[in-house]
């Protein structure tokens, strides 16, 4: 792969080492694209992450947060080390089951500037995700079948997200600090305002394994934010209209910021 197409694999983990082990082993077994660097950021403050991935034989680099700093700040730490033009963002609770998906995603990102990231998860595990994807007809580009929902289909989601998928480093750099923005939903809104959104491969490549193991529950590591399920930190007084700017200074409308349901 030429330098202008190089990819860094970045995975966020938080103490669910059994799920992490399956994630990296199945990705390694299915992936056929050259990966320049393999980076894991571990935010549990617990030992075990190195042992969980040792069997892959891959040259993982580790960023271990102790004490934990949260997902968004962890993403900032990991992304700050990336120098390749593309990165495959992954979480610790996925199972991959087919090859070629990284190369297919690269085709879309190279040809479609309006695509912020390329998702590859299967249907049937997230009803809202499935409903958004279903609004777009299948399209084909250089043999890759995909869907690209228009930004207006959902008020908040599908502008950007942290499910497994390839994305451009340049877009992440343009966005800036994820921790400073607040939550995954605010990243999504930022990209939507710029007319960008996530594409979804018609032939899926992965499925989540952590639906019953959200990081905030008793079987996982305490103190982790459940991204997309909470308001931004702090409280503010509601403005007269939910369409007014949020008083917190985020630049979002109140209904898309502190006015989001908890």
Model-based region annotation:
Residues 16-30:
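Short, well-formed alpha-helical segments that are part of the catalytic scaffolds
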Residues 22, 157-239:
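C-terminal catalytic/acceptor-binding lobe
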Residues 40-50:
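A conserved acidic beta->alpha catalytic loop
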Residues 66-81:
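Glycine-rich, basic loop-to-helix element that forms the pyrophosphate-binding segment
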Residues 85-95:
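Short beta-strand-to-loop acidic/aromatic patch adjacent to the donor-nucleotide binding site
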Residues 99-118:
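Conserved donor-nucleotide/metal-binding helix-loop-beta segment in metal-dependent transferases, i.e.
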Residues 118-133:
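Short beta-strand-to-loop element that shapes/binds the nucleotide-sugar donor at the catalytic cleft/hinge
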Residues 231-262:
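Acidic/negatively charged segments and metal-coordination signatures
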